[in-house]
A protein has these predicted regions:
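N-terminal ligand-binding lobe of clamshell/alpha-beta domains
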Residues: 1-275
Length: 275
């Protein structure tokens, strides 16, 4: 009788977005990676060590096939065409579509399972959960909570996605556009009328323009925005999109830490409001 085949875990993985690359490095499974996105910034060494095969919505399909991956990891509807092309070529593809903190943690669990290392994934998840809990505990001590407006894009104006909204709340802020944060697609988070932001009266403005350099003058010169407390008091900040707009370890560590620092400093300066 023939023996049943044993599982063969992927050894030649291509990551089309940054978060799976970073997760594999943190799990010390980076030896499996043979290709990455050209937009990968974390960890920095990945840019030196791995072949770049894609942008965000485009990929070098011939190069990917040449590398002979046994698994390609993709993300979201934005990479649907890339995924379709690879599947037609017989490539094994797993496409994640996580948009919240809990889904991001589950992504790590799933990823670790795909490579036969579930305990490493659980360890990383536990560390990330512990970090978030610590930040949340500190935020609970803040004397006052600011209203935070997070801008993901400037023209049209697009507000923060789900996990960003959750991180703002964990860090001690109140997301001005919680109702938009539930929308996974950017087109459904467009603020059609910029005066709506004025009506929200945010205390803090945070920009993360998805890879574009932040232009403070462009923001403060918007019609009527001088009436916004955040603009009036120069509580205007930028968080690098690499640190917050990738739904992976970066957002749950460095990203939320930057939010917490901005919010806690504001709360300290404005603690008289709570008296």
């Amino acid at each position: 009788m023939n023996q049943l085949p044993h599982p063969k875990w992927p050894e030649r993985i291509i990551c089309l977005t940054e978060e799976t690359t970073e997760a594999l490095y943190l799990m010390e499974e980076d030896h499996r990676i043979i290709g990455i996105s050209a937009y990968t910034m974390r960890p920095e060494r990945a840019r030196r060590e791995k072949t770049k095969v894609s942008a965000y919505i485009t990929a070098r399909t011939e190069k990917i096939l040449e590398l002979k991956p046994d698994l390609v990891l993709a993300f979201s509807d934005m990479q649907a065409d890339i995924v379709a092309d690879l599947i037609k070529e017989g490539v094994q593809v797993h496409c994640f579509n996580h948009r919240s903190i809990s889904e991001t943690l589950q992504m790590i669990r799933t990823l670790s399972g795909l490579i036969g290392q579930p305990e490493k994934g659980e360890k990383l998840v536990t560390e990330l959960q512990s970090n978030l809990a610590s930040i949340q505990q500190q935020a609970a001590k803040l004397p006052v909570r600011p209203k935070v407006y997070f801008e993901e894009w400037f023209d049209p104006i697009i507000t923060g996605i789900g996990w960003v909204s959750e991180l703002i709340e964990i860090a001690g802020g109140i997301d001005c556009y919680q109702e938009f944060a539930k929308q996974s697609l950017a087109k459904n988070r467009i603020v059609a009328d910029a005066s709506d932001v004025i009506a929200k009266q945010p205390d803090i403005y945070i920009a993360s323009w998805c890879g574009r350099k932040f232009d403070k003058e462009k923001v403060i010169s918007r019609d009527g925005w001088q009436e916004i407390p955040a603009i009036k008091n120069d509580d205007i900040y930028e968080v690098n999109s690499t640190d917050i707009l990738q739904p992976g370890p970066a957002a749950l560590t460095d990203g939320v830490a930057q939010l917490a620092n901005i919010i806690s400093q504001w709360a300290e300066r404005n603690k008289k409001q709570s008296n």
